[in-house]
Amino acid sequence: MSTSDSIVSSQTKQSSWRKSDTTWTLGLFGTAIGAGVLFFPIRAGFGGLIPILLMLVLAYPIAFYCHRALARLCLSGSNPSGNITETVEEHFGKTGGVVITFLYFFAICPLLWIYGVTITNTFMTFWENQLGFAPLNRGFVALFLLLLMAFVIWFGKDLMVKVMSYLVWPFIASLVLISLSLIPYWNSAVIDQVDLGSLSLTGHDGILITVWLGISIMVFSFNFSPIVSSFVVSKREEYEKDFGRDFTERKCSQIISRASMLMVAVVMFFAFSCLFTLSPANMAEAKAQNIPVLSYLANHFASMTGTKTTLAITLEYAASIIALVAIFKSFFGHYLGTLEGLNGLILKFGYKGDKTKVSLGKLNTISMIFIMGSTWVVAYANPNILDLIEAMGAPIIASLLCLLPMYAIRKAPSLAKYRGRLDNVFVTVIGLLTILNIVYKLF
């Protein structure tokens, strides 16, 4: 073998799938699997079997193409170590940097409000149905839970970051185990309700409207956009110098594809298992009760008549506890992102970007008061969680995940090679449909 052949062979070996690629695949997958997936089965199963089958077809393309578009935007910056804010500033100037800062903050903050409502409802449901205690005042419960989380965050943030990282895989394993454990309770109700003669494409409960609203919950549930920038920077630093940017882009796409497959497999299996255990009518009831599907499952098993099996009793309590842990995990993770974003906005507009004018402790205190105060108000008001996701959470995520990369591809010279592709049309349509949910909710 010649020297040149040895070099090529060595480079091929080094550029093949690495342990770090597996780590990032699992990291992207773990980031997406949080409390948001506990609402996906409700919206997906709301319209019955046919809409959820259509969502199954759309799930992987939405997850893969949208995140790949955002990764391509992050890859387009001249600095391999530059994050998404720096890349957007490079393409669109300081105004673009301000816009991306606002988008990141407003993409995460409404999620905290959603989780504030969810943790309150889940705890109250567990308190009343599983523990059998008298109902508590909603405002008191929300305040107590938020103060508890604020105390933990203030005095044990580093510990919580470690705990959250350890909780990711037990939570995913719990979802899979619950999905498998529900199989003995599957029934044919959702299949029996399929009447091809009475199916409607349009109308309030038509297939198209159900799938349209389902797209927004998929954008919300299949979302690991907060970690994409860090992921791309890591891969650029690892691969770009030796193998070039095109190779790095293909490697990132490969990792995103595998993470999306894992994510869709776990979430869709969980959704189908819930739907075959319950029914579309049960999903509608869960939406009306404003609780995640695990809490509804716990109440479902609690209300079973006759002698309960050990499995049914275990599912009754395990479902609620897993839901509570999942929401706590997601709340802490999104709180840290919201805190960082709000600190940046306060520093930029309140102190003209001068870090010497205010201490980090003061910034954290101001931000915490606003974040926890606004979350308590929303939790006390108890708006419908799915409506919040469809009208606020998902559209803002879509503007960041779908429309910003598509605009950059159209305007930025370094992204010109991606213009005119069919997948760009798909990503743009998904982004616009998700944002148009706001109009649908208003009218």
Curated annotation (Swiss-Prot):
Q: Where in the cell is it found?
A: Cell inner membrane
Record's protein name? Threonine/serine transporter TdcC
Locate the transmembrane regions by residue number: 22-42, 44-64, 97-117, 140-160, 163-183, 207-227, 261-281, 312-332, 366-386, 389-409, 423-443
Q: Identify the InterPro entries for this entry.
A: Amino_acid_transport_2, Hydroxy_aa_transpt, Thr/Ser_transpt_TdcC
Q: In what way does this protein cross or attach to the membrane?
A: Multi-pass membrane protein
Entry's HAMAP family? Thr_Ser_transp_TdcC
Q: What does this protein do?
A: Involved in the import of threonine and serine into the cell, with the concomitant import of a proton (symport system).
The answer to whether keyword Cell membrane applies is yes
Its lineage opens with: Bacteria, Pseudomonadati, Pseudomonadota, Gammaproteobacteria, Enterobacterales
Q: Any keyword tRNA-binding?
A: no
Give the family, as the similarity comment puts it: Belongs to the amino acid/polyamine transporter 2 family. SdaC/TdcC subfamily.
Q: Name one GO cellular component term.
A: plasma membrane
